[in-house]
């Protein structure tokens, strides 16, 4: 997605050898116009897949997931990283390791929001080691729902996440694919959409 790649080049900051900081438009402050365009691209890609729910993990995946769900006309569910006292009924859970935060979280979705009648589109902000999407695949599997695809806003193709996810047989669509960071600059690979 050219618009996204241009924004990454303009406002993204490369930190070290494998971190891209995009807090000015995705991971802290949200550019809703860009997120709306991202949502439309994902919706167009999966419009024939019979999507009934869009699923993400809090927090930075919420904005693109909301706009994808809106464009598809379906609900969006976000897996919570901390169980709260209102989550008293059946809970679907998985452990997820965050590459950026370097912590493992137990993420949860209330079971009544997903069923074996659902066809899900997973959306996430980044794909690095694939653990977030893998955890969501596990939760969705616990519900007996089907996953039509995984939509990634920014993929770090030099890490092993895509390989991990492709082994599941679920299609992966990344709007910006980063081949490398060279001398503090982003080098893109060809995107999926």
Swiss-Prot record:
Q: What is this protein called?
A: Xanthine phosphoribosyltransferase
Q: Which SUPFAM superfamilies match?
A: PRTase-like (SSF53271)
Which InterPro entries does the protein's record reference? PRibTrfase_dom (IPR000836), PRTase-like (IPR029057), Pur/Pyrimidine_PRTase (IPR050118), Xanthine_PRibTrfase (IPR010079)
**GO cellular component term, pick one:** cytoplasm
- Asked if the keyword Glycosyltransferase belongs to this entry, the reply reads yes
Enumerate the catalysed reactions. Answer: XMP + diphosphate = xanthine + 5-phospho-alpha-D-ribose 1-diphosphate
- A Pfam family it matches: Pribosyltran
Q: Which organism is it from?
A: Streptococcus agalactiae serotype V (strain ATCC BAA-611 / 2603 V/R)
What pathway is it annotated to?
Answer: Purine metabolism; XMP biosynthesis via salvage pathway; XMP from xanthine: step 1/1
Gene Ontology terms describing biological process: purine ribonucleoside salvage; xanthine metabolic process; XMP salvage
């Amino acid at each position: 997605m050219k618009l996204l790649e241009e924004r990454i080049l303009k406002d993204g900051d490369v930190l070290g050898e494998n971190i891209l900081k995009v807090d000015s438009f995705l991971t802290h402050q949200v550019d809703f116009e860009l997120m709306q365009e991202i949502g439309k691209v994902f919706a167009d890609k999966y419009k024939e897949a019979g999507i009934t729910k869009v699923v993400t993990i809090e927090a930075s995946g919420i904005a693109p997931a909301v706009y994808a769900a809106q464009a598809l006309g379906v609900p969006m569910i976000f897996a919570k990283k901390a169980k709260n006292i209102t989550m008293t009924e059946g809970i679907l859970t998985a452990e997820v390791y965050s590459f950026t935060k370097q912590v493992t979280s137990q993420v949860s979705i209330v079971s009544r929001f997903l069923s074996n009648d659902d066809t899900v589109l997973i959306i996430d902000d980044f794909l690095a080691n694939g653990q977030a999407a893998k955890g969501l695949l596990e939760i969705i599997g616990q519900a007996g729902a089907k996953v039509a695809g995984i939509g990634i806003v920014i993929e770090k193709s030099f890490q092993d996440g895509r390989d991990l996810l492709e082994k599941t047989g679920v299609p992966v669509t990344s709007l910006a694919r980063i081949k490398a960071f060279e001398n503090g600059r982003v080098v893109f690979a060809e995107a999926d959409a």
